[in-house]
Amino acid sequence: MAAKSDGRLKMKKSSDVAFTPLQNSDHSGSVQGLAPGLPSGSGAEDEEAAGGGCCPDGGGCSRCCCCCAGSGSSAGSGGSGGVAGPGGGGAGSAALCLRLGREQRRYSLWDCLWILAAVAVYFADVGTDVWLAVDYYLRGQRWWFGLTLFFVVLGSLSVQVFSFRWFVHDFSTEDSATAAAASSCPQPGADCKTVVGGGSAAGEGEARPSTPQRQASNASKSNIAAANSGSNSSGATRASGKHRSASCSFCIWLLQSLIHIFQLGQIWRYFHTIYLGIRSRQSGENDRWRFYWKMVYEYADVSMLHLLATFLESAPQLVLQLCIIVQTHSLQALQGFTAAASLVSLAWALASYQKALRDSRDDKKPISYMAVIIQFCWHFFTIAARVITFALFASVFQLYFGIFIVLHWCIMTFWIVHCETEFCITKWEEIVFDMVVGIIYIFSWFNVKEGRTRCRLFIYYFVILLENTALSALWYLYKAPQIADAFAIPALCVVFSSFLTGVVFMLMYYAFFHPNGPRFGQSPSCACEDPAAAFPLPPDVATSTLRSISNNRSVVSDRDQKFAERDGCVPVFQVRPTAPSTPSSRPPRIEESVIKIDLFRNRYPAWERHVLDRSLRKAILAFECSPSPPRLQYKDDALIQERLEYETTL
């Protein structure tokens, strides 16, 4: 990826990441350049367009929440490339970046209990599978022992490989970011320009004049830099620090290698998530957000690993054990516990991953625990009906069951490809990803594309209902003679009642528990009537936004006022008089880093967004000098998102 001078991030076929944080300010955004791979002083410098203000003429340009550091015109060399206003370069623009960021959350007891419950589900799933495999071996049933153990080993090895690969990527990225930051801050107290990744320079520009806000920011950064780099005053001290760092790195590598060799990578990540959450509660105000977001990212990683493990181990294990139960016409307690644990693990992984995705995204509202429980029940009952149908059909038609699975997988994969997902860079990598998601679609619904899912949900579950009905009917017609109707009819009732219950929970979730409100009863026309209604803004932000555009729209306001007097009604949009904005009448604004990324975030599926965020998160957390968490700002072509997430020219 290559960076531009305005801080936008372009994607290319490379793993390098470079971007520019846009620092918050009261009157104008200050751009702190990041020059990956360049020494201090030779890369991007602090930029400002000619004129010394937010706009060249010093007025007319309003930055809602003051996070966009672009000028009204690109006059002067090294300008940040802001959006031109309607009146041309001299008139300025009202480029808005309406902040969607939620208020800072804190790690709670419920978060800890949720993670501990996930650990318990994982132990119950894997533990019962291993116990059942040992039981099959002791009873001399080597074929069932081999199949049961095979799925356990397959899921565990796959998870450890992915987990260790992520550790190597994160650890190497963190080391490179730390080394680059140390090289760019040669002296204690210097204004640190964090260097992230590798790539081209972010741009060059003029030195920014000193302002009171910037002086306060530099003072706070200098204090933190001095506290972090106070031991770098002599060459001997730096050499000993390097030696200690190498020893520490070796110990970490050895520990992580042993953890993953003993198949404990997922458990380690769960407890590391709890540790980061506790640290976030015990840390000060400046470090609390950093540990909290590290915890959120770690939980997203381990949730994705759990999702991978369930569809490689729990799902085939569940079908296998149910087939054995139907073929032997007997149910042992251990077999029942194993099947139940696998089913719970499947539903838990899907619901937990959706929660982790929403928690790790600034542009999404967090999902409540009640909504997660409803999602768990939705997936639990629909997957239960699905696997029971598979077990019944496979007990009679083993060969045709394999043909059906392959055919269903091909159809689902073709459908996913038709949805035009954008997960990978190349076309063939995208097809491989769609094939993997097609395996998930054998058992349950998994959203792979942003946008309205009502039609796709209806099509998917309608197809699943038809398949379950056909497979159950074929089993009932061709079942073994020794299977009486006293067993067959209740089995069919369980299949259809379970599926119906899952659909009811799905409707409950979208009708009452969806984070964005009820999803039913909203037509596309009414959804576009007031696109900003679903995203409430702080009072001071909304007031300053309306006040900033009142001068540019005085003619429209006068015309609306005349129409209002004539019709005897108040205009819909009206600017309220407010107190003059003085330093004493408004609260101090916390400086914030905003990373603008020139990517269409909402075109990416949920899984791909997680991978994309993983490539950025370590670089984001490298801003140790920032008193508030950096915020990602993606480009979007939708009306609502373009008004509320990205720059819009008014």
From Swiss-Prot:
Q: Where is the composition biased (Polar residues)?
A: 21-31
Compartment annotation: Cell membrane
Question: Which stretches of sequence are listed as region Disordered?
Answer: 1-44, 200-238
In chain numbering, the residues marked as site (Cleavage) are: 567-568
Ordered alphabetically, the record's keywords are: Apoptosis, Cell membrane, Membrane, Phosphoprotein, Transmembrane, Transmembrane helix
Membrane-crossing residue ranges in chain numbering = 114-134, 144-164, 248-268, 306-326, 331-351, 365-385, 396-418, 428-448, 457-477, 487-507
Say which domain of life the source belongs to.
Answer: Eukaryota
Q: What are its GO biological-process terms?
A: apoptotic process involved in development; engulfment of apoptotic cell; phosphatidylserine exposure on apoptotic cell surface
Q: Does the keyword Transcription regulation apply?
A: no
Which residue intervals are annotated with compositional bias (Basic and acidic residues) in the record?
A: 1-15
A cellular-component GO term for this protein: plasma membrane
Keyword Transmembrane tagged? yes
Entry-linked Pfam families: XK-related (PF09815)
Q: Which family does it belong to?
A: Belongs to the XK family.
Question: What is the name of this protein?
Answer: XK-related protein 4
**From what organism does this protein derive?**
Pan troglodytes (Chimpanzee)
